[in-house]
Amino acid sequence: MQQEAERCRVRTKRPDMALYVPKARRGTALLKSSDQEEGHGPPAFVPKDQKEGCLPQKISASKPESQRRGAGHSDRKDVDCREGKRSASQLRKDRCPQKQNKEKACSKKGAEESTEASSQEHQHRAPDAGIVSSIPLQRLFKPKDMDCWEVQTAGATGHWRVSPSQSSSEVSAAQVPSRPFQNVELCDFSGETFVNRNLESSIVTEAKVPELVSQFPQVVTTLLKPDGMAMPVTLSSDSETAPSSLETPDGMSKHSPGDISVVSVPGGPDEDVDSTFVDFEVESEGTVNSTESVLGQKGVDSILETVDNVSLKMAVVSKLESTNGTIDPAVTRECESDSSADELCVKSEPSDTAVLVHEIDTDDGFRNVCDSTSKACMVDIAGTACDPVTEGSSCTGAVGESGESSGNMRNFSDYIEMSADVAPLDRAKSENDSENISSLSACSDIYAESIASGFTESTGKLIESVSDGASSLPIKKTADSNIATCLDSELSMSDASDVLLESALGSDLDTTEEMTEALHDLKTAEEFKTKEEDYSESVVCGISFSDSSVETSVDLKTTDTSHIQGSSAVEESWESMFNDDGDCVDPRLLLELSGNVKNRKSIQEPRFDYYSHELPDIDLSECEFPHVIEIYDFPQEFRTEDLLRIFCSYQKKGFDIKWVDDTHALGVFASPITARDALGTKHTMVKIRPLSQATRAAKAKARACAEFLQPAKERPETSAALARRLVISALGVRSKQSKTEREAELRKLQEARERKRLEAKQREDIWEGRDQSVV
């Protein structure tokens, strides 16, 4: 019976060939899946129960029934165990998406890998798999969860501070062999992948985000953005490390060999990580003291190539003196370090600009030197000194960015405020002044020598011309008339004035005579245009050459500005034009005001009296409604019957009443003749008058009801004799009317016929003009 039932059983639908696994290979597939779940252990560690469960069905069929039942029970346990493992592996596969293969940081397996970590991992996983072994596994696993993922995103780059949880597995320094990392390859963060191949230590991470997190001495990796800009990547750890790296703006990083102290492999769930630019920040307790290794000759050359693209064509020579940090001047971002202020010395060609020194403070952050293409430079010669960039000169400058865009160095002199100490100026007095005329310290000396005498003569004219043209100048340029005294007392003369004016300051400040001539040309109505943002904003070109003369020059600027503005303010002040009572004192204004005032009366009187406005009366001629009269001045208690009783004599010929209000009504007659006849009669209770003399309301009522003002014709006299005769003949009943009544109806009908015949004959006689007496 069982064979027949099995023969009649419906066969299940076979799956596709691509997914179909033959019966002979099913046991092998289960073995392979279980082996993969157990961390790729040696084949000697396959449990005995599992081997027995994987025997072919033919062997189990040859056993006795009792053994088969026992084997089936054990097989059921094995199947349950495999299903549990399969569900666990499925959960782990769900947590790691399809990008698991791309995001792993693969490394070679070594013979000297950590034994304690692997044994701990094996002990954690052994109860699940049911395997007991004494040989450690050859694979490290990432922690399953993380405590905190802090993401701080600013612009295109961000800081991810990753701290593994206490439950996450960490490999100590004693467990990991001391070997240097080699052939580190870093991929683009924008592609959500981060591959580090060819590592000698075995580190396997299965996170979704780039998770190559390792700390080792003398190595700081550099992550590459999509545009090729280098980002310093540092790693966090609890142990001391002393990383040092060679970072260049073109994205290259050189690592010095060292030993691995700590390898931390953080990981986390996939839902906690985003595909953003990742920058791991290091908090190292060690120190890095290197100047040549931090930024070598190759880094300098690459920086020079980057800065050459700037319109100023400056070559950058970076000298970094740091004690606890690593600085990359090409990266525009902030790095936390305790190092002192680093100085970026910028050397320029003598034919273009002066020497600029860019001070970079690492506590405040990096400043990108290459971003000054469309911005003008403000140069301040400060009192600090740095290592000489060119022979025979020593200067220190700060490159700032002005608010206005200027890519041309010919406008460079309009935005310069120079101040220098006596010590740099004394050092600048050297035999190489003529050779290094492009430096700003020599610029101040030679410029002071050349224009000391000419500037004194021209400043007086400049103040006079500015005072005359103050009303027409949108931007006031003031100069100090006593500047020559400060220049002569503190500065020495030199012989290279003309060359300095052409090379350093350009053609905008060749001579002060051009400024004087330009201001004099304003009087002759020639154009002198300057760019401005506001009329209240003024550009002051002041030149001071020592710390002691800074206060003096500021005071002189203030006095000159007040003097220039005072000349125009006296003329336009309210006190000079009006007295305390508010009367005008200026005769010119009095003449102007008195001449423009008109004494003629210009008020236009209204043509209409809007207060006594009345609507025009409705003009109704007598011929428009001649058959209508107005009935007025009667008591309010009167009704229609009372008025009809008064005009009862005209009711037979046709008469009707139309009410206007309680005391006014319209009387409509059959003809104008009857209406004129009614106007001739006098009544004691009412008064009558024609419609042309009626009130405005009565006229409006008459015009509104014009089509209803015709008198209604009387209904002709009829009898029911014909109707009664038709009903009797149709129903076949006898009439109940008496003989006398019937004769009276016949008589009325005959009279009506006769009257109708006479009216028709009279109408005809009227048209024919016949005499009606005959009738």
Curated annotation (Swiss-Prot):
Keyword terms: Coiled coil, Phosphoprotein
InterPro entries hit by this protein: Nucleotide-bd_a/b_plait_sf (IPR012677), R3HC1/R3HCL (IPR039884)
Gene3D superfamilies: 3.30.70.330
Composition bias type Basic and acidic residues, residue spans: 1-16, 65-112
Residue numbers of Phosphoserine PTMs: 671
Biased composition (Polar residues): 235-247
UniProt protein name: Coiled-coil domain-containing protein R3HCC1L
Species per Swiss-Prot/TrEMBL record: Mus musculus (Mouse)
Lineage: Eukaryota, Metazoa, Chordata, Craniata, Vertebrata
Gene of this entry: R3hcc1l
